[in-house]
């Protein structure tokens, strides 16, 4: 992917390790919109510098200027700048109020919020391969891990509407050796929405003559007071699915989550994570710059397939991408340190399971069948990475419990 640099001198007080950051964006994205895009991005970075150094009056002035020249309905650079500017504005207001605006991740979602997010994710699934890749790759790994098993228990740490599981039901139902039972334990924020998801999955399983049970748990795994709520049974193969995102907190207490997984000793954990490596407890500017680069690629990818007038595009950008940007920029910070999950899973007794071979081949075939160009698939050290013009967006990996020596 050809990129173009935008250089800004960033204050060393915020990030002592680097007095200057070089920010690179897809050259075609910038060239299509010319000097206007470069000016917008430069203004946004200047505003981020002001916020990082608590020059809030200057930041507010610059945000007013930015709001006059960019729109969430314009070009891809305009749109991404508009959402990052909104997030900076939220952070500025929070700073004026002495932190009165608490992180969204600490607030349970209302039913209405959940429904809006789930609906927007369904739309995203119809206009982009990212969610399809997540579901398909994890399902292939799970199917392989369940070879020879006839009693299955899947623990989905964020089941949402359960969109992933009908495809797995299909391939499990096609096996010569029929399942004696398949259970899904699904975590979620609303008992009503969980019940609705359970009914849909039960109806689908029934249509395939699969013996199915759904076990809803309202809440998040890291806050589980009694791990026996997971209700594992003797002789069943246990799989944990963990799709990470930044729409809301999925796991709660990181250390408790790891301890529960360690004690659970599942046959397999499938993890799909965004390729954002910043540390929430570190530099604000570091978090801002990496997020700006990452989400610029996502906006560019959507813009490549959908026009500026597309209602689907606006829905995804506003409810999915805009919410994640706000959580990273306006609410992210030192309250909670992001784990490096690869290292942490290894530390508590898990080893990676390679996704090369059939999962990689099947993922490549899926990507080739979809109508979107510009996406790339790379197998690296047994993981699968989906990218946009060579910038990694999602990484899928699988893990297996192993005893300590």
Curated annotation (Swiss-Prot):
For the region Leucine repeat I (LRI), give the residue spans. 38-102
Where is the motif LxCxE motif annotated in this sequence? Answer: 45-49
Record keyword Membrane present: no
What does the entry state regarding organ or tissue expression? Expressed in seedlings, cotyledons, shoot apex, leaves and flowers.
Ranges spanned by the short sequence motif VHIID, renumbered to the chain: 152-156
Q: Where does this chain mainly localize? A: nucleus
Residue limits of the GRAS domain? 31-400
Chain residue ranges for the region called VHIID: 121-186
Q: Which residues form the signal peptide?
A: none
Q: Which domain of life is it from?
A: Eukaryota
Q: Where is this region: Leucine repeat II (LRII)?
A: 196-228
Q: Which GO terms describe its cellular component?
A: nucleus
A Pfam family annotated for this chain is: GRAS
Output one GO MF annotation.
Answer: transcription cis-regulatory region binding
Name the GO terms of the biological process aspect: bundle sheath cell fate specification; endodermal cell fate specification; leaf development; regulation of DNA-templated transcription
**Ranges where the record places region SAW:** 330-400
Q: Where is this region: PFYRE?
A: 238-327
Can you say where in the cell this protein is located?
A: Nucleus
What biological function has been recorded for the protein in this entry?
Answer: Probable transcription factor involved in plant development.
Q: Into which family does the record put it? A: Belongs to the GRAS family.
Oligomer status and interactors: Interacts with SHR.
Protein name, as recorded: Scarecrow-like protein 23
């Amino acid at each position: 992917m050809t990129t173009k640099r935008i250089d800004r001198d960033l204050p060393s007080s915020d990030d002592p390790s680097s007095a200057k950051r070089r920010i690179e964006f897809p050259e075609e994205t910038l060239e299509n919109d010319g000097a206007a895009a470069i000016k917008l991005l430069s203004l946004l970075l200047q505003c981020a510098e002001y916020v990082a150094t608590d020059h809030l009056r200057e930041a507010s002035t610059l945000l007013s200027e930015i709001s006059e020249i960019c729109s969430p309905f314009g070009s891809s650079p305009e749109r991404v700048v508009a959402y990052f500017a909104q997030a900076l504005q939220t952070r500025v207001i929070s700073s004026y109020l002495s932190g009165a605006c608490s992180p969204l991740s600490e607030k349970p979602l209302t039913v209405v919020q959940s429904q809006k997010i789930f609906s927007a994710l369904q739309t995203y699934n119809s206009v982009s391969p990212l969610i399809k890749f997540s579901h398909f790759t994890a399902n292939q790994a799970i199917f392989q891990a369940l070879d020879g098993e006839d009693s299955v228990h899947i623990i989905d740490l964020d089941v949402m509407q359960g969109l992933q599981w009908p495809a797995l039901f299909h391939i499990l139902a096609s096996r010569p050796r029929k399942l004696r039972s398949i259970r899904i334990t699904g975590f979620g924020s609303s008992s009503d929405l969980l019940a609705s998801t359970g009914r849909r999955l039960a109806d689908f399983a029934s249509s395939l003559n699969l013996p199915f049970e759904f076990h809803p748990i309202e809440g998040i795994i890291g806050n589980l007071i009694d791990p026996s709520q997971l209700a594992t049974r003797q002789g069943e193969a246990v799989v944990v699915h963990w799709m990470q995102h930044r729409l809301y907190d999925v796991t709660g207490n990181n250390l408790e989550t790891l301890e529960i997984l360690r004690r659970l000793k599942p046959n397999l954990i499938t993890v799909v994570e965004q390729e954002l490596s910043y540390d929430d407890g570190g530099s604000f500017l570091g978090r801002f710059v990496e997020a700006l680069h990452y989400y610029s690629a996502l906006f560019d990818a959507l813009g490549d397939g959908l026009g500026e007038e597309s209602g689907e595009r606006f829905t995804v950008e506003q409810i999915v991408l805009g919410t994640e940007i706000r959580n990273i920029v306006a609410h992210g910070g030192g309250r909670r340190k992001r784990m490096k999950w690869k290292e942490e899973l290894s530390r508590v007794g898990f080893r990676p399971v390679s996704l090369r071979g059939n999962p990689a081949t099947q993922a490549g075939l899926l990507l080739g069948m979809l109508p979107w160009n510009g996406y790339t698939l790379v197998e690296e050290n047994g993981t699968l990475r989906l990218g946009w013009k060579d910038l990694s967006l999602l990484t899928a990996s699988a893990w297996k419990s192993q005893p300590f020596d």
